[in-house]
C-alpha cells in the first residue's frame, strides 16, 4: 500500500515539473505531502490511496495551512472507501477537491473535469443564465423542458437560477434537446474559502508561546500550525510585499531539528519567503541556516530588523 502511494507521489512530482511547476521535496508525517508553485498558482497537495482516510482534523489543518500560505489544497487519490475513483470526476473531502492522477494530468493539459460526485450520484455545473436565455429564445416552456428532462418544473427553475445542479443524465437530455453546450468545467485551482484560521497557543510549550508572542510584538501576524514541518507561519506586509516567514521553534539544536529546518529553508524559497529557526538555547553560530535565540529576538525592534537580520545570515550562507 505504501509503495503505491510512493509511486503516485513521484508521478505527481514528475507531472508538475513537466508543466513548469517548482515542487518541494515530498514530506513525511505532515498534513500535506508537497507544495507546488508556478506564477500565481500555489498548490498544497495531499496524495492518498484512499481519499476517505483523510480525517476531519487533517483536512482542517490542510485547509488552514493552504489559507495561511495563500494556496489551494488538492487531494490526488486512487479510491474512495467503497470504490475506485472515476476518471474525469471531482470528489470532495470536507470541502477539499479530490481527483485521480489522470484527471489532474488532463486538467494541467487544458481539459478540466466536468463531473463532480455528491450524495446521490454524479452531477455537473451548468450555465443557468444561458439555459434560460436559450429556452426563452426557442419559445420552450419550463413545463416542456421539465418533461423532456424527466424532472420537475421547480428543478428547471433551480438550474436556471444556479440554486441546484442537474445530474449528468439530466444535463445531457437538456443539452441534446436545446442543442447548446451548457456544462461548465470545474476549476481545480479555485481557493477554498471555508476555513477560519484558529490560532491555538494554549497547547504549546511556554518557550514556543514566548517566541510567537515576540514575533507578534515585532509586527508580524503569526499563525500556529500542527502536522507540518514548521511550527508557525509569520506574515508581514512591507513595501507592498507580503513577507512569509516559516518558523521552527525548538528548545535546543540536534540533528533532527537541523534536518527539519534545512527542509523548511528550501520550502520557504519555493514560497518566495524566509525560514527561521528560533532556539531557546543557541549554543553556536550556524553556517547554513538562519537561526536566532529567543534572547536575540527580544533585542530586535521591529519586523524589518528581523527580516534584514535573516537576509544578512543568508548572505553569509551563500
UniProtKB/Swiss-Prot annotation:
Residues in HTH cro/C1-type domain copies: 131-189
Gene Ontology molecular function, alphabetical: DNA binding; DNA-binding transcription factor activity
SMART domains per record: HTH_XRE (SM00530)
Domain of life of the native organism: Archaea
This protein's UniProt keywords: DNA-binding, Transcription, Transcription regulation
PROSITE patterns per UniProt: HTH_CROC1
DNA-binding residue intervals: 142-161
Keyword presence, Transit peptide: no
Pfam families: HTH_3 (PF01381)
Alphabetized NCBIfam families for the sequence: PRK04140.1
Identification of the protein by name: Putative HTH-type transcriptional regulatory protein MJ1164
Organism annotation: Methanocaldococcus jannaschii (strain ATCC 43067 / DSM 2661 / JAL-1 / JCM 10045 / NBRC 100440)
Amino acid at each position: 500500500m505504501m509503495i503505491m502511494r510512493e509511486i503516485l507521489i513521484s508521478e505527481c512530482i514528475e507531472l508538475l515539473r513537466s508543466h513548469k511547476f517548482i515542487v518541494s521535496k515530498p514530506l513525511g508525517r505532515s498534513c500535506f505531502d508537497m507544495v507546488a508553485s508556478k506564477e500565481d498558482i500555489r498548490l498544497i497537495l495531499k496524495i492518498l490511496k484512499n481519499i476517505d482516510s483523510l480525517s476531519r482534523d487533517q483536512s482542517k489543518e490542510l485547509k488552514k495551512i493552504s489559507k495561511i500560505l495563500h494556496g489551494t489544497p488538492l487531494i490526488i487519490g486512487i479510491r474512495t472507501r467503497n470504490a475506485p475513483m472515476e476518471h474525469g470526476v471531482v470528489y470532495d473531502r470536507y470541502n477539499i477537491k479530490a481527483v485521480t492522477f489522470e484527471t489532474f494530468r488532463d486538467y494541467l493539459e487544458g481539459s478540466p473535469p466536468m463531473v463532480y460526485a455528491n450524495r446521490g450520484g454524479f452531477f455537473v455545473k451548468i450555465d443557468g443564465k444561458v439555459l434560460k436565455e436559450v429556452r426563452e429564445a426557442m419559445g420552450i416552456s419550463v413545463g416542456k423542458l421539465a418533461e423532456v428532462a424527466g424532472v420537475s418544473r421547480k428543478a428547471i427553475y433551480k438550474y436556471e437560477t444556479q440554486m441546484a445542479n442537474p445530474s449528468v443524465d439530466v444535463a445531457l437530455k437538456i443539452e441534446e434537446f436545446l442543442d447548446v453546450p451548457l456544462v461548465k468545467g470545474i476549476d481545480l485551482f479555485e481557493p477554498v474559502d471555508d476555513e477560519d484560521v484558529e490560532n491555538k497557543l494554549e497547547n504549546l510549550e511556554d518557550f514556543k508561546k514566548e517566541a510567537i508572542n515576540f514575533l507578534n510584538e515585532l509586527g508580524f501576524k503569526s499563525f500556529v500550525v500542527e502536522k507540518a514541518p514548521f511550527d508557525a507561519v509569520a506574515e508581514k506586509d512591507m513595501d507592498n510585499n507580503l513577507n512569509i516567514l516559516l518558523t521552527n521553534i525548538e528548545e535546543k539544536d540536534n540533528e533532527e531539528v537541523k534536518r527539519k529546518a534545512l527542509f523548511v529553508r528550501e520550502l520557504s524559497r519555493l514560497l518566495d519567503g524566509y525560514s527561521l529557526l528560533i532556539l531557546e538555547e543557541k549554543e553556536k553560530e550556524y553556517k547554513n541556516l538562519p537561526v536566532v535565540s529567543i534572547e536575540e529576538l527580544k533585542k530586535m525592534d521591529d519586523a524589518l530588523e528581523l527580516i534584514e537580520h535573516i537576509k544578512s545570515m543568508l548572505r553569509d550562507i551563500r
